[in-house]
Amino acid sequence: MSSTVTATDVLRDAYGRIRDALPGLIGRLDDRTLLWRPDRDANSIGWLAWHLTRVQDDHVAGVGRVQQVWTREGFHDRFGLPYEVENIGYGQTSAEVGAFNVTDVDLLVGYHDSVHTMTMRVLDELEAASADGGSDGDSGYARVVDAHWDPPVTVAVRLVSVIGDAQAHLGQIGYLRGMAQRR
């Protein structure tokens, strides 16, 4: 076994921690707690779990140039939300957040599990492309995925950004859970 730790190893670990944390945070919560909002403009636990998974699905699928799990595996239909298929929750109004009504923890966790599996596949492909040296200039972690920023956003930056976003939302879920259980 090699003692070398690669960027892919670190990313796998970070995404694995997200995957491991979510069920423990939302499991066994009742419907009321999943949808509770501390005020009319706040996000609910259920919405945050959905949103962090939608962002990971959207961004990692984009990096991997694959179809999102949301549509490929029919989660858009299973969730039955009143949002456009491409909606990931970013910039939603308070009314749109309030329209989130999913209380099926197994569905939320199952969607995240499927996104995690896709994420691991994309990381495997990126590792192979990086090992190849990215000789075509369009593969691996250095590939630019969004040139609208200065500096342009690379695959590596996008993947780390998704991790940071998900970790922030997991913290919000934990905080909301504590608040909801004390009301």
Task: Locate predicted features.
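Detector for methionine-enriched segments
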Residues: 1, 118-120, 179
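Extreme N-terminal tail/first-helix region
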Residues: 1-14
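A short alpha-helix capping/helix-coil boundary motif
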Residues: 2-4, 98-100, 144
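Short, conserved clusters of charged catalytic residues that mark active-site
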Residues: 6, 103, 107, 154
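Hydrophobic alpha-helical core bundles mediating ligand binding, dimerization, or RNAP-core interactions
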Residues: 11, 15, 19-22, 26, ...
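Short, contiguous alpha-helical
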Residues: 12-16, 23, 33-89, 124, ...
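Acidic/histidine-rich alpha-helical segments that form the ligand environment
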Residues: 82-140, 160
